[in-house]
Every structure is written in structure tokens, then in C-alpha cells.
Amino acid sequence: MRLSPVSLRLSRGPALLALALPLAAALAFSDETLDKVTKSEGYCSRILRAQGTRREGYTEFSLRVEGDPDFYKPGSSYRVTLSAAPPSYFRGFTLIALKENQEGDKEEDHAGTFQIIDEEETQFMSNCPVAVTESTPRRRTRIQVFWIAPPTGTGCVILKASIVQKRIIYFQDEGSLTKKLCEQDPTLDGVTDRPILDCCACGTAKYRLTFYGNWSEKTHPKDYPRRANHWSAIIGGSHSKNYVLWEYGGYASEGVKQVAELGSPVKMEEEIRQQSDEVLTVIKAKAQWPAWQPVNVRAAPSAEFSVDRTRHLMSFLTMMGPSPDWNVGLSAEDLCTKECGWVQKVVQDLIPWDAGTDSGVTYESPNKPTIPQEKIRPLTSLDHPQSPFYDPEGGSITQVARVVIERIARKGEQCNIVPDNVDDIVADLAPEEKDEDDTPETCIYSNWSPWSACSSSTCEKGKRMRQRMLKAQLDLSVPCPDTQDFQPCMGPGCSDEDGSTCTMSEWITWSPCSVSCGMGMRSRERYVKQFPEDGSVCMLPTEETEKCTVNEECSPSSCLVTEWGEWDDCSATCGMGMKKRHRMVKMSPADGSMCKAETSQAEKCMMPECHTIPCLLSPWSEWSDCSVTCGKGMRTRQRMLKSLAELGDCNEDLEQAEKCMLPECPIDCELSEWSQWSECNKSCGKGHMIRTRTIQMEPQFGGVPCPETVQRKKCRTRKCLRSPSVQKLRWREARESRRSEQLREESDGEQFPGCRMRPWTAWSECTKLCGGGIQERYMTVKKRFKSSQFTSCKDKKEIRACNVHPC
């Protein structure tokens, strides 16, 4: 029985991929070929028997992990290839991943996750679900699967392989059929891996980068920003080892800073283009508003780029918005292999990193520049309790995005003689690379049909075709591209395989018997999965019928019914639905009882995949002016709803907002309020008094300068008396002296009419060192006389100016 899932999670402990190759399907070999597979009492038996001597696969067969690493990074994806050197081949195989020094008889002995690449070639074993085996028994020279490395703490993993080549030739585990990988030191996670070898590949390769944003309220519920969540436009490039866009442990450039804080790729693109000698392709893809939507509603953004021998690295980044300065991306991803070829596929799960330019800790923290600037580093779950990724136990952060980089073409003479797979041969045959898919959003198509047989009947270049249907054209003014697609191919006869065979699906279950009693008929169907490569007609049957018996003899209570009618149309026009069929009672039971025969049947039916016509929107308007005339602000743009969706409301955003930055705002001088006027500096005649104010904020960025801080105005008290004679002055002074001496004897404080005062305090310190300040001193009442007719005794205060010289 064939399993449907394309991936299987193994035990949580991180281990490397141990590959073992058992022959699982009974169709693969007869009893004469293999001994019976005995059932193990352990978790997964990997027993494979063949007649003859077991041999070591040192030369003919090899098990290889792409890039030939000695270490694995937990959670990363690795392509694993099992191949035979020509003219050798194999028919049966099994792959399995075991922790080091484990036998595989318990579930916890296994580690990592397998992912099926081609279901026509590989599948999970029905009696050993952690192992991968062949889908159909046939001659082959290579198979490939992905292995997702286990979590941190698993240790080393052994990849093991077992194969059966012919009836009596059997290989397992030894030599080049094993591969040991150990867990990468976690202390190296914070440093970007740098290429250490020069690239030796020839020609150029073209890749497609596809970005899948998985950041949503479901995956990251804490403080998720519902209104403004988005990914900024992707910006990056393919470049040489002499240029670094960004890296862990390095400092963000101004371009990286503007992507991280504002989501603007303009400065970053300018920086990349300035390195024209080191850059081959600038990578750009549109922003995503909101951050996550199902792929059947919005296609994942993608971009194509090329690499060559000197510019074989690629880097990119995109801002996670809103956020202080958080991004995801790849840095210096090497697409060149040690075998002088080009990597076929890279799959990486991404966690956010901090650009080191803003110190905010939540999605919508206010701007708080980091001074001095810090180094780029990955975010962790222990950064801050208010962080949306905080975990007091220090667990790993759930990935927020996944990037897939796939090779789609190669041009020029290639160095590696053996291609990665048949698709690579076809890609090399292509006279020119295809442009990026520019299908308008207003054109709704069905899925592509399978490829036809190759037009060449010999081992020569030919063409094959596939088709799709135009289901809807939402805007008649926008033409829809062709509904046919052609691709180069190689005709049959290029391998040892029989090109005249066709691949069939499994038989579906038998239909119900056509009668409710006695002898009837039933049928089952299958379909052609792959037509013969030589272009011949597939002669294998697609329908079978056989006799069936129900209750053998019809009793007197049995009734006679008609044949089943045709099935009704499916209740759904797309996706899953129900269909019914009916039959009639031709003759009721002879004993007069009710006919118990079934007269209607219902079963599920599957129509083509649903392609809901989306709501039609106008293009985005131009961005509005910044909300401020200086400093940091916001700007917006809008679009209009032209028509509703086919099924329900339109959930697309009609307005977008982003940060904008203008020159710093001028800061005017700020002053305190004026002080009280001081007392007149003359006790009689004309004088002046002053008041002061202090500077609280100096002017900046061209702001209004500070005005005066000291003001003077004239004052006039009583007229001064004419100068008395010298004799009168002496007499008055003597009288005043005697009076003062008398008062000092009566009281230790100064006396005013009706009260006795304490002496003046010392002058306070000046409020400013320059620019005009003030000083104060006080005199307080010590005693009021009851017999006094004066009731105006009050504390007194004097103010005078000080340090009035300019600063």
C-alpha cells in the first residue's frame, strides 16, 4: 500500500540521516529472488534477503549528501543521493537514518525528517514508516530525497543504504553506502559561514528564489500586530566573496538600516549597484501585505537570478514589519559545489535577526536608536520578557519564513560530466532560458496537464508538450498568455530502461455488485500515470470486470432490481463533492414483504482543484506625502475594489502604510518665564530695576535663536532731600547711633514699626554662570508687638541680577 504523505517527522532528537535500503514491495521480486521477510519484534525491521553472497558497495554504488558536509545544522534541509556508477544500476533500495551506535529497533533510535522529492520514484515503507524505499520496481541509476536535520542535542547520525541490484547481488551499509554527520557546534551559529574554497564550476546557472512567509497570528500569537503586519520588498544579489551585503557579527550598512527600520530597499539597491564588479544580479521581489495569506489566495513572491564562477554567492533580506529593526534573510549562500557543479536546491527555515540599529523590544516599540550601533545578531527567546519571542525556558524561536532556491537552468559548457538528474539534461538542452512567469493576475487557469511523450523516437533531442485551460479572463483589456507549453527532451533509448513501458496507477476498489442476490458483475478502474517514452500507445487495460455473487440464491423474500443507473453529476464544481446513482425495483418479493435491496448509492467525488476568482482591485495609487514635514512620519497609498470575489467578500487590504524619513526638524530656543522685577537700586530719586529668564533649550538644526535674557526699566522713588548742613548731619548721625545702640540692647534682631525682624540671610548662589541670572535673600519676622497699631509686618525678599555678562 502506498503512503500519501510526502514527509515524515522522525524522533525529536537531532541526528544525521542514516540511510538503509530494504526492498519493501512484493511486486519487486518473486519468492525465487528473495527469502521471506521476517517480522521483527523491534520498532522497525530492516531485514532484506537475497540469494548469493553479500558484497560491499565501495565502487559501484555511493550514498552522498550534497556538499559533502561533515556536520549538519539542526533544522536545515539536505539533499541525499543514492547513485550507481554506469554501467551498474539497482532496482530495490531502502534509506533510513539512525543515531550513532543505535540499531533502529526503537522509535527513539531514528532522527530527522525525510521528504519525498518524486513520488514516482520513492515512497515511505508501509511496514517501516521511518524508511524510504522504491515506488515501483525498475532499473534505475539514482534516486534523491531530502532529509531535514533533527533538533539540537541529537549528536551524530549515520546514514545507511541497502540495495538489491539483481536477484543474487546484494549490498548493504558498507563502504560508500554509509555517511556519518555530526551536529554543528552551536557556538558557531552566531557567525555567518564564509566560503573557504574558490568555485570551479563552468558556465552559469539560473535560480529561482521563492519566499514563503509563515509569520501569522496562529504561529506567533503573542502581541501579533493584526493591522500592519507585512514583509517588506525583498532585496539582495548574487555576488562574489569580496562583497558582503550583511552578516552575523558585522555592522549594518545604511542600506541595511533603512530596510530594517523603514522597510525601504532603495538605499540597499543603490549600495549593491555600486559594487557592479562584484555583483552579477540584483534580486528584487515585491512586498507582502498582509504578512501571510494562503498560497491559493496569493502566490508566494519569487525572483530569478544567475550565478557564475566568480559570483557564486547569494544574499538577501526583508524586513519583518512592524518591528524595531528585525529582518530575515540569507547571507553568502554558496551555490557552487566541490564537484565543480551547481547546487540543485536549497531549503532554509528562517528566524528573525536584529540589525543592531534600534533598541525596541516589541513589534511596535517607539523609535529608540541604538547608540553606539551594535552588531547584527539572531534574536533569541531570552532577549527580553516583553519580546514576542520570549520563552523563559530558552527554547528555540519558531521559524517565521522559509526560502526555497531552485536551479531552473544552466548555460554554457558545464564542468561536471554526470548530471544531477534527467531534468538537468533537459535544462542543458534548452536553447535559451525562460523568462519569469508573467501571467497576469486577471487570468485564471487550470493546472497544467502531464507532459506528453517526447517527439523524438530515438535517443535524440525532441520536444514534449503540456496544456492548461483558461477558466476566466477578468479584464478583457489584458491579454492572457498561451495555454500550451513546450520543453526540450531526450528520446527513448538513452538508458538501459525499456522505453516502451507505461506506468499505471494502482487499481481503485471494486464497485458494488450489480445485484442484491444471485450472480452479478462488478468493475474497477485505473489510469495511465506516464505514457511510454518512445511515444507508443499504452496497451495495458484501464478497466476490469468480474462476476460477483450475493447470497448465492435468491430467496422468496428477495426482490428483482434493475442495473444501477449512471452516476449523477458531482455536487461540487471543484474540489470534493458527492455523487449519487439509483436503480429501481423491477419485481417485489413473492412473499409480499418489503424489498430490502439498496436502491440508491452515494460516494465522494473529486473535481479539479478549486480556483476561486479573486476580487478585482485597481492598481495601488502613488504614495502620499509624508505625514510630517521633517523627521520620522508615515505615508499611505490606496487602491479601489473594482469587483467582489466569486465566493464571498474581498479580504484584501485597500490601504497600506509605511514609515518615511525626512531631514531633522529645527529646534527653537526655549526660555523660562521672566522672574519678578527686582527692587529699585536707588532709595530716592531715579534708578532702575531688572528681571531675568534662563535658557532651557539651545537652538538646533537652524531653529530660532535665543532672545535677550535680561531686561531693565527705570524706577523713581521719593525725591531726595536737599543736603543738610554738616553740623545737622553730625547731630543726626549721633542720634541715630544712640538709637541703634539702644535697639541692639533691647533686641537681638532688626526692628520695624510694630514688629521685630531677623537679620537678612546671605545672598543665594547665582542661578547662571553667564547670560544673566538672579540672586535672592530673605528677612523673616521674629516677633509682632501686640500694642502696635501696625499690622503690616511681613517677611521680606530681595532680588538682584548677577552674572549678566554674555556666555
From Swiss-Prot:
Record's GO cellular component terms: collagen-containing extracellular matrix; extracellular region
Binding site residues for Ca(2+): D325, D354, D358
Classification via InterPro entries: Reeler_dom (IPR002861), Reeler_sf (IPR042307), Spondin/Thrombospondin_T1 (IPR051418), Spondin_N (IPR009465), Spondin_N_sf (IPR038678), TSP1_rpt (IPR000884), TSP1_rpt_sf (IPR036383), TSP1_spondin_dom (IPR044004)
Record: glycosylation sites: N214, N681
Residue ranges of domain TSP type-1 in the record: 442-495, 501-555, 558-611, 614-666, 668-721, 754-806
Subcellular location: Secreted, Extracellular space, Extracellular matrix
A Pfam family matched in the record: TSP_1
Glycosyltransferase in keyword set: no
Signal peptide location: 1-28
One annotated GO molecular function: LBD domain binding
Record GO biological process: cell adhesion; negative regulation of amyloid-beta formation; positive regulation of amyloid precursor protein catabolic process; positive regulation of protein processing; protein processing
CDD domains linked to this entry: Reeler (cd08544)
Residues covered by region (Disordered): 732-752
Disulfide bonds: C44-C128, C156-C182, C199-C336, C200-C340, C202-C415, C443-C480, C454-C489, C459-C494, C502-C538, C513-C517, C548-C554, C559-C595, C570-C574, C605-C610, C615-C650, C626-C630, C660-C665
Residue stretches making up the Spondin domain: 195-388
Listed Basic and acidic residues bias regions: 732-746
Role according to the record: Cell adhesion protein that promotes the attachment of spinal cord and sensory neuron cells and the outgrowth of neurites in vitro. May contribute to the growth and guidance of axons in both the spinal cord and the PNS.
Subunit and partners: Binds to the central extracellular domain of APP and inhibits beta-secretase cleavage of APP.
Alphabetical list of PANTHER family matching this protein: SPONDIN (PTHR11311), SPONDIN-1 (PTHR11311:SF16)
The name this protein goes by in its record: Spondin-1
Originating species: Mus musculus
